[in-house]
């Protein structure tokens, strides 16, 4: 029975076969970008490991420590990044290190991005916490885009730890 006069709203479009589409075949630029990063000469200021307390979400003073998880400081004071300093002390002199506390230096994202280029860290190590997670990940993104391997620690690095640990 053919119903040519039926309104399109009354026809069950889900009952017909949908042709399979081929997968998108985008060019892979990874090798070219990676080669360009490796070919670039390292500056005299380049470090092995950059330990970072990234810029804060709103430019205010925030606390990122294991026992004061990612909150604005009520006291309006800078909490020193003792954990980053301790790790730097353990890594030096075997590795060249740079500790950057953007919170203490009142450094914004633009200034921090400009700081990454001369130091060209091989590894970017930072503390993360749930309240500032998106902000903290942006720092990792900037470092990774410049060829650094990123390392994060903290109380709430991810809401999906099992998925994160998969290869």
What are the functions of these language-model segments?
Residues 58-63, 88, 114-115:
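Short, flexible segments with low predicted structural confidence
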Residues 50-53, 88, 92:
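Short, amphipathic alpha-helical segments that act as regulatory/interfacial helices
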Residues 26, 32, 39, 45-78:
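Short glycine-rich His-centered loop
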Residues 6-9, 16, 30-31, 45, ...:
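Residue-level marker of intrinsically disordered, low-complexity segments enriched
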Residues 1-42:
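Non-catalytic N-terminal targeting/anchoring module and adjacent flexible stem/linker
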Residues 83, 90-167:
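Glycine-rich beta-alpha loop elements in corrinoid/cobalamin-binding modules
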Residues 76-86:
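Conserved alpha-helical elements of sugar-nucleotide-dependent glycosyltransferases
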Residues 41-45, 117-120:
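Flexible, charged surface loops at secondary-structure boundaries
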């Amino acid at each position: 029975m053919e119903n040519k006069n039926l309104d399109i709203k009354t026809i069950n479009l889900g009952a017909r076969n949908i042709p399979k589409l081929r997968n998108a075949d985008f060019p892979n630029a990874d090798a070219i970008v990676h080669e360009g990063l490796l070919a670039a000469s390292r500056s005299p200021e380049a470090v092995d490991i950059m330990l970072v307390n990234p810029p804060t979400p709103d430019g205010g003073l925030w606390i990122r420590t294991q026992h004061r998880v990612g909150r604005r400081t009520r006291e309006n004071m800078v909490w020193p990044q003792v954990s980053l300093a301790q790790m730097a002390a353990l890594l030096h002199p075997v590795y060249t290190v740079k500790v950057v506390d953007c919170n203490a230096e009142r450094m914004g994202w633009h200034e921090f991005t400009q700081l990454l280029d001369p130091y060209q860290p091989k590894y970017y190590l930072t503390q993360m916490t749930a309240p500032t997670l998106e902000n903290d990940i942006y720092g990792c993104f900037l470092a990774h885009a410049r060829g650094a391997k990123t390392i994060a620690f903290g109380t709430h690095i991810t809401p999906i730890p099992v998925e994160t640990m998969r290869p």
